[in-house]
Regions:
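Bacterial peptidoglycan biogenesis and beta-lactam-recognition machinery
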Residues: 1-5
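Structured C-terminal helix/loop/strand segments within mature extracytoplasmic catalytic/sensor domains
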Residues: 48-118
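A structural signal for well-ordered alpha-helical scaffolds and beta->alpha junctions
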Residues: 6, 22, 102-105
């Protein structure tokens, strides 16, 4: 397979910037080196985008997660023509995600990592 993004760039994304030691951030990515998402591996890093989209990378698990958004009725029946599925809160081990997008993204990353490892 062909590597599109240079390896050095990918490696740097996972390392916090030395220019701002108080915030786990590098090349537009939030870095988990200080445990921002405690249940995810420390080598994880992610970037949230508009509309609730996000990209999460966990090199130690050989894992890349692309989270699709869904705010502002983006996937509503009136916009897609498809019936909406009802939500369920009775699944064992599942919790309602936080309203804050940053916290919800961290929880999503932790749950995906747990399912890969577990």
């Amino acid at each position: 397979s062909e590597q599109i993004v240079p390896e050095s760039y990918v490696r740097q994304c996972a390392n916090p910037s030395p220019y701002n030691p108080h915030f786990p951030y590098s090349l537009q990515f939030t870095v988990n080196a200080m445990g921002e998402a405690p249940a995810a591996p420390r080598d994880a890093y992610w970037k949230a985008g508009s509309g609730g989209h996000a990209l999460c990378v966990v090199p130690s698990l050989d894992l890349v997660v692309w989270k699709l958004g869904g705010r502002d009725e983006q996937y509503s029946e009136k916009n897609t023509g498809l019936p909406e599925h009802s939500t369920r809160d009775d699944r064992e081990g599942w919790e309602k995600l936080a309203e804050d997008d940053g916290e919800a993204l961290k929880k999503t990353l932790e749950m995906v990592c747990a399912s890969v490892v577990g």
